[in-house]
């Protein structure tokens, strides 16, 4: 058994496969995810686990180049959750964010119920 960091085996494997410029999503409980996109579903009940808990655990393990959130998140908690953790944050409409989902490596679904708690994360390199 691992003694620290991510414990979910599917999430560990997915994170280990990420390369420079590849993207993944940390999503709220309601984001419609295309059937062809791999989903790591961590949701237990509505509200658990929270977006920030999952986001922080993943960010401890990956190098991040930037992120994309929905315009609709601006001025609300999801924007601050992302901007507090990632320097380069772009915005697109929620519809455009959903249209980008088929191109991500995977989606991590949380139990978060705060609207627009979704972020596309772009991986960097540690050198």
Swiss-Prot record:
It is found in: Cytoplasm. GO terms for molecular function: D-ribose pyranase activity; intramolecular lyase activity; monosaccharide binding. The keyword Cytoplasm applies. Keywords: Carbohydrate metabolism, Cytoplasm, Isomerase. Substrate binds at residues 28, 94, 116-118. One of its GO terms (cellular component) is cytosol. Its main location: cytoplasm. Pathway: Carbohydrate metabolism; D-ribose degradation; D-ribose 5-phosphate from beta-D-ribopyranose: step 1/2. One of its GO terms (biological process) is D-ribose catabolic process. It catalyses: beta-D-ribopyranose = beta-D-ribofuranose. It is an enzyme of class 5 (isomerase). Its EC number is 5.4.99.62. The active site is at residue 20. Homodecamer. Belongs to the RbsD / FucU family. RbsD subfamily. Catalyzes the interconversion of beta-pyran and beta-furan forms of D-ribose. PANTHER family: D-RIBOSE PYRANASE. This is D-ribose pyranase.
